[in-house]
């Protein structure tokens, strides 16, 4: 269930707080293969299941770290809805990203979003989110990112 805000300035009251935890989302092998094609990153650890079963320490194919990272936008739509006062939101960048553990094909991930900071910039509010992508069945996150989003008002 998303956190629903009537206006973007209501984010000010949430700085320093965990905002939401998304539902689990499957990372199917087919999605990994499609991402490999789109990005032209066809390294065998992502697309060759037989070789990965034989040679990889993970025992199967794994998702690209950038695939996991690219899903933050999808998860944010599930996590937070701002009903009014936003013309558009823009992915402004990342301050820091790490991939502490691998996402095996056919596993599930979800995201915890914490609002680290919020500041006024010309025509927008700039939010920095701590995004911790969790892997079902693991205590260790598979991605940790400081994500900068601008909400143009």
Describe every region a protein language model picked out.
Residues 1-14, 99-153:
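HotDog/MaoC-like acyl-thioester-processing domains
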Residues 2-63:
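Catalytic strand-loop segment that frames the active site of acyl-thioester-processing enzymes
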Residues 17, 21-23, 31, 41-43, ...:
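A generic structural signal for short beta-strands and their flanking turns/coil linkers
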Residues 20, 24-26, 98, 148-150:
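Generic structural detector for well-ordered beta-strands
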Residues 21, 70, 111-113:
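A generic structural signal for residues embedded in beta-strands
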Residues 59-60, 73-112:
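Hydrophobic beta-strand-centered segment that forms part of the acyl-chain substrate-binding groove
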């Amino acid at each position: 269930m998303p956190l629903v805000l009537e206006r973007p300035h209501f984010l000010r009251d949430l700085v320093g707080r965990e905002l939401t935890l998304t539902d689990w989302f499957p990372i199917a092998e087919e999605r990994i293969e499609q991402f490999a094609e789109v990005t032209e990153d066809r390294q065998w650890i992502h697309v060759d299941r037989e070789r990965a079963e034989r040679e990889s320490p993970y025992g199967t194919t794994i998702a690209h770290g950038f695939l996991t990272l690219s899903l933050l936008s999808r998860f944010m739509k599930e996590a937070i809805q701002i009903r009014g006062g936003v013309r558009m939101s823009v992915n402004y960048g990342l301050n820091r990203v790490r991939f502490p553990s691998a996402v095996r094909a056919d596993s599930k991930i979800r995201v915890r979003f914490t609002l680290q900071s919020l500041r006024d910039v010309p025509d927008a509010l700039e939010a920095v989110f701590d995004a911790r992508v969790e892997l079902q069945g693991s205590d260790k996150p598979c991605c940790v990112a400081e994500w900068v989003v601008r909400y143009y008002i």
